[in-house]
């Protein structure tokens, strides 16, 4: 079960970076890391900080989600919330989620998912663009995700319900935007990039943890897939 929810560390990305293609190899990723590191982020109260500060001192797993109303993203982040902080501390690794909604949605999303690791937002999708995150879904088989509990009908209904009953009626981000996963730091180094091709193409969490030497987590103690 996830640890009790704590006040999340939250900042919002702003700025006006132009889209850029992502280089193809680790050596050429360093200028890309340096470029995104200079983009400013804001926390939930609007305080600015450079994105690069998040991975300057240690390695960071950075998960870019589609949007906070996406039921698949919600269930994926629910499993991220189950990663014990002690596991990350032992490996000297930080876990960060980036969304693309207004920062006003961050605290409700954390309460909903039980997520208490670091979380920020990029409402204008500037970092998404710089990193080459896809917009629109590629038709490709991504297999069965170990982190998705709902089917498309039940999940979509719950997402719509959250949209119409929330204090701000919006989609909490561009619904066509896809996410991805990176491993960065310390400093301006990118060690791994995965671009999601569609909403189900996120990396299994334990495969990412393995890359940074973090212990595997048992995500199986949860309800079966919900059918409607």
Curated annotation (Swiss-Prot):
Family assignment from sequence similarity = Belongs to the peroxiredoxin-like PRXL2 family. PRXL2C subfamily.
Q: From what superkingdom does this record's organism come? A: Eukaryota
List, alphabetically, the InterPro entries matched: PXL2A/B/C, Thioredoxin-like_sf
Question: Where is the segment annotated Disordered?
Answer: 1-22
What is any Pfam family matched here? AhpC-TSA_2
**Source organism per UniProt:** Bos taurus (Bovine)
Name of the protein: Peroxiredoxin-like 2C
Which gene is annotated as encoding this protein in its UniProt record?
PRXL2C
The UniProt regions of compositional bias labelled Low complexity, in chain numbering, are: 13-22
Q: Which biological process terms from the Gene Ontology are attached to this UniProt entry?
A: positive regulation of ERK1 and ERK2 cascade; positive regulation of glycolytic process
Q: Which SUPFAM superfamilies does the protein's record reference?
A: Thioredoxin-like
Purpose of the protein = May positively regulate ERK1/2 signaling and AKT1 activation leading to HIF1A up-regulation with an increased expression of glycolysis genes and enhanced glycolysis.
């Amino acid at each position: 079960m996830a640890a009790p929810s704590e006040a999340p560390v939250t900042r919002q990305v702003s700025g006006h970076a132009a889209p850029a293609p992502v280089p193809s190899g680790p050596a050429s990723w360093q200028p890309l890391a340096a470029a995104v590191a200079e983009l400013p982020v804001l926390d939930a109260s609007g305080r600015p900080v450079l994105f690069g500060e998040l991975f300057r001192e240690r390695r960071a797993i950075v998960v870019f989600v589609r949007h906070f109303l996406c039921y698949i993203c919600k269930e994926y982040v629910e499993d991220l919330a189950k990663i014990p902080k002690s596991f990350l501390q032992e490996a000297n690794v930080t876990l960060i989620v980036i969304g693309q909604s207004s920062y006003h949605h961050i605290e409700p999303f954390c309460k909903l998912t039980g997520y208490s690791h670091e979380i920020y937002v990029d409402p204008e999708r500037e970092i998404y663009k710089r990193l080459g995150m896809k917009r629109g879904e590629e038709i490709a088989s991504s297999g069965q995700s170990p982190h998705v509990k709902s089917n498309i009908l039940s999940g979509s209904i719950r997402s719509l319900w959250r949209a119409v009953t929330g204090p701000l009626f919006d989609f909490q981000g561009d619904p066509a935007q896809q996410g991805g996963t990176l491993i960065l730091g310390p400093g301006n180094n990118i060690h791994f990039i995965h671009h999601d091709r569609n909403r189900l193409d996120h990396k299994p969490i334990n495969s990412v943890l393995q890359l940074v030497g973090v212990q595997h987590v048992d995500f199986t103690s949860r309800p079966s897939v919900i059918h409607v």
